[in-house]
C-alpha cells in the first residue's frame, strides 16, 4: 500500500506521499509518484491502494473537475456517485485524497466523500501512524504544514513496512 498525508496550516495546504509500490511482500518500486497536481495546478490529489485503479480514478476525477469548472466538492461527489453505481468502477481498490485552496476531502470506493476535521488527511497502510504524528505536531508545535507533513510521513515510513522514505510533496496557498 502506501501512506498519504495532507495538512492545512498557516495559509498553506500540503499533500505528501511515499514512493513504495509493493506486490505482496515484495517491493517492486521505491520512487512512485502518488501525489500530483490536477486541474491547472489548482488541486492536489494523492492515492492509496492499487496503482492501476488509482490512475483510472485520477483520470475520472480530473474529468469531473473539468466538467464542474474546478469545483472540488461537486467533482468529488460526482466521482463518488459514479464509483458507487458504475460496475467497472465499483471493483476498483483505491482511495483518493484531494485538496484545493478551500477544502480537503477523502473519496472512498464506498461512495463516501469526507471532509476531515482540522484539515488533516492521513490514509493508506501507514495512515494511522502518520495521523497520530501529525496530530501531535499540530497540537504541540508551530511547525509549518510542510514540516508537519514531512515529519509525519517520515514517522510512518519508520514504522510501516509498506511505506518508504521517498517523499513526493506538493503545496498550495490555502484560503485563510
Swiss-Prot record:
Binding site for Na(+): 157, 160, 163
Protein's job: Protease subunit of a proteasome-like degradation complex believed to be a general protein degrading machinery.
CDD domains named in the record: protease_HslV
HAMAP family: HslV
EC code: 3.4.25.2
Activity regulation as described: Allosterically activated by HslU binding.
Full protein name: ATP-dependent protease subunit HslV
Recorded name of the encoding gene: hslV
The keyword Manganese appears for this protein: no
Database matches in Pfam families: Proteasome
Top-level taxon in the UniProt lineage: Bacteria
Quaternary context: A double ring-shaped homohexamer of HslV is capped on each side by a ring-shaped HslU homohexamer. The assembly of the HslU/HslV complex is dependent on binding of ATP.
Organism: Ectopseudomonas mendocina (strain ymp)
Keyword Metal-binding: yes
